[in-house]
Amino acid sequence: MLRMSQSKGTVWAIASSRRFSQVSVLLPILGILAATPLQARPITPAVDGTGTVVTKDGNRFDINGGSLSSDSTNLFHSFEEFGLSEGQIANFLSNPQIQNILGRVVGGDASIINGLIQVTGGNSNLFLMNPAGIVFGANARLNVPADFMATTATGIGFGDKNWFNGFGSNDYLNLVGTPNRFAFDLSPGGSIINAGNLRVGRGDNLTLLGGTVVSSGQVSAPGGEITISAVPGERLVRVSQPGSMLSLEIELPRDQDGLLLPIKPLDLAGLLTGQGGNVETGLRVNSDGNVQLAGSDFGVRNRDVVAKNVTAQTATLSAANNLILVESRLQTRGDLNLLARNTVLVRDSVANPFVAHAGRNLYIQGNRSIDILALNHVSQTPFVSGGNLSLVSNGIISGDAHFASGGSLAMLNLSGEPGNFVSLYDPIISANGDVVFGNYNGVALKVEATGSISGGDIVITGADTSGSIPTTDPHYTELTTSRALILQAGKTTLDNAPNLPQSSVGETNFTSPLEDLLPRGSIQVGNITTQSGVNGIDSGSITLEALGNIITGNVFSRTAGGVFNSQNNAGNITIISRGGSIDTSAGSVDAGASIGSGGNITLMAQKDITTSTLFSYVIRSDGGSAGNINITSKEGSINTTAGNGQILTVAPQKTGQVMLIASGDITTGTISSDGNLGGGDITIKSENGSINTAAGTL
């Protein structure tokens, strides 16, 4: 879906009436700034009875006349051609009564605009419609007093049935009120390219709406909303009022004679090569016909959206296919929405960072997948939100970047359930709220939150060797040298806090998705494994720290099963709840090894601790020592009888100690500390309760 923007009492919003369908994730190849052979055709009025008059005065084209609606608030123009060369000005003449100026281009050629578009004499919104395509060159600029929209729609609707048609006749007198629909009769719809610097005034809105939209230049709407959207062909886009969503109606609007419209827009490659001249657009067409942005390896297809530089109060970028963000700088003081029917693709480079900073909520949805790789700039966190940060997909969420949220952070599927994510190189997540995700598979992971953490199964596959973790991070060594997992909930101070001015956040009410499910500052995850199946590579340490409760399934930092000759060491397992309870009864806690050494297991809670089997062992007779197992409950009880209910530290050499200390009752199964060269001490101490070992042996 696309989010909404305010425009002097009108909200422009675009959304799908149904879930975006799943489409192929495959992309062609992309590349960067190149001179594109396009030539601006002069501004020529259409001879169709609309009454548009164009007067040339040096480099300025004064646009007057036209047709008015019956209430004189909407002014309509019709052009055979509309283009500007460098240094030229299109001057739309208005008056204080005119709220909207709408211009159409009917000649069948794309508009090549490499000069200035302005409105004088009134504070009118300006709509420019050319179904054949619109190109803003590197020298394109705006000087408009209100909102601006460029669209390749074939019609702009007023009310339920009145249309400003892109071709044919119009009943201008009946086109009253505010434009609220946009018809795209052609498939694919025409393309829009912006290589210029398009800027509207403070509080005004800027919209680029087409079949494919590529903005390699700058778009700015300080205090207003930017919408950049590629829509499917043969759709009707409806404008909604605040609080509602807009639909893409499945119908094929025709012209008044019932015939298909008389042009076929050029695709992106045809638009770039078909009209001669030289306008810098930031695009090139390869010999195989693929369109490329400079400096990347991802191509641009029909219905894609590409955006490079966006600055606004709020912004929505929405693609009917892929949303491609290469070296982009996207900055809003309010919400930022990044949406794709297929894939949201993000890349930085060694030369240029990727930045998506939202003063309020940052929402990223790729229906098929989210593909993020932005690790080249250690000093700058790519994804930062003052409010909540959401990554939503029914496919894989690949998050090789650092994420910092001033609210909660959630990785979800389209149904709102926790979504799975992977990272091949380096994920760091920091949230001033809750963190929610499904299963994780990837390299060493750190998640820190002032709220709670809820996750699925976690598999750590290697150390983080990307070089993108700041050396100032207190877990730098663990993360960069081992298969480490670090989950920290209920923190008062984040190691990697979001860096946004407080004024950007405003009065956002941050939502806590876990507040009804877990006590604040809790951790609940599925099975955890940091085990290594590669000889000579140790298993990673596991650290879970929370203010509230901690609940887990299996917790494995052992050498992988079946690797009998592995000389790996197991990792240490540390689970600490500063104010709640610990429950690992749904699985085993295992820090065993084959030939190497077993890891230490430490469980410490303010309240009760409930466990199943706890293992630190060494299998082979030529192996090392087993680790210590320490369980401490400061104000609660300890019960280790779930499942098999065993506590074992066993090794052919020495074993560690076993220590259980609680304020309340202690109930155990079998406890063993057995080593050929000496077993460790077993200590069981209850300060105010009873000790029951009847369920096993010591």
What residue spans do the PLM features occupy?
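Extracellular and secretory-pathway beta-repeat/beta-biased strand scaffolds
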Residues: 2-698
